Design a protein with these regions (language model features):
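N-terminal Rossmann-like or analogous alpha/beta NTP/dinucleotide-binding catalytic cores
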Residues: 1-14, 21-143
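Short hydrophobic beta-strand segments
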Residues: 14-17, 156
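Active-site cores that bind ATP or allylic diphosphates and position pyrophosphate for catalysis
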Residues: 22, 99-102, 111-267
């Protein structure tokens, strides 16, 4: 509400979202980023897009070199979505550490290890880099204001799994003299195999990738899409699937803009 009130009174805001570059882009990514693009087009605002290559190196069993290759590929993938090139800025954590790190240590000084442990369930076996990472993800909330000598609100559309980071960010950011960000949570897009969980590029055979051909998409849906069907083929043909868990129906909620048509399909 504060952000919208500020916007209504003539103030600008900027968008911040991101990507952990460790694999190919899939339909779940697109469902969030297409909304980000809509926001940018609708409000004509700047977008700061963070590629958290450090996060993926610290959290996943993948080499630094592999992550850099995925960073390059994912940058091309994001650019292909059609964001306004004159108002879209890419931040790569390792490449732009020179401007991110000085602010990250200011954030880190306000976050206790106890807070990180309780938020993420860390133990003594976690590497110290992963403990620090939340500070890096916090910086783009206010970095554009520092670089441009402004005091604008930040709006963050994000997947719900990123919420623990930004809960911490919101708790400490006021202590540094910056405005708390506004956050819009996006639901996980159901995986092909069922309504529980999220789409993931780690299992590309059962995930719709943005690089898949129409033939590959059709094959994956026919082979893996969960329908919540009846006990027998005959009953399924008569009664159909369970629309509350049917993956195709869940996906149509994201991509079918006509609510009337969607209701007819559900019937």
């Amino acid at each position: 509400e504060k952000l919208l009130d500020a916007y209504d009174s003539g103030e600008k805001f900027f968008l911040y979202t991101g990507c952990g570059p460790s694999g190919p882009i899939h339909l779940g990514h697109y469902s969030v980023w297409s909304f980000v693009k809509w926001l940018q087009d609708k409000f004509d605002v700047e977008l700061w897009f963070q590629f958290t290559d450090d996060e993926k190196f610290l959290y996943k069993n993948i080499t630094y070199e592999e992550i850099q290759e995925w960073t390059k590929q994912n940058m091309l993938d994001v650019a292909a979505l059609g964001f306004n090139p004159s108002k879209t800025h890419f931040l790569i954590d390792t490449k732009h550490a020179g401007i991110i790190y000085p602010e990250a240590i200011k954030v880190a000084k306000k976050i206790t290890f106890s807070t990180i442990k309780s938020s993420f369930g860390f133990t003594d076996s976690n590497n110290i880099g992963s403990i620090f990472y939340t500070a890096m993800q916090t910086v783009p909330i206010f970095l554009p204001n520092i670089l441009n000598n402004k005091d604008e609100y930040c709006l963050i559309p994000l997947a719900v799994d990123q919420d623990p980071h930004f809960r911490i960010s919101r708790d400490v950011i006021g202590k540094l003299g910056h405005k708390k960000p506004a956050i819009i949570h996006a639901k996980f897009m159901s995986p092909l195999t069922g309504a529980v969980g999220k789409a993931s590029s780690s299992n590309s055979s059962k995930t719709i990738l943005m690089t898949d051909s129409p033939k590959e998409v059709k094959s994956k849906i026919n082979k893996y899409a969960f329908s919540g069907g009846q006990d027998t083929v005959e009953e399924h043909r008569k009664k159909g699937g369970n629309v509350d868990v049917d993956v195709a129906c869940q996906w149509l909620k994201y991509f079918e803009h006509d609510d009337k048509k969607l209701a007819e399909i559900y019937e």
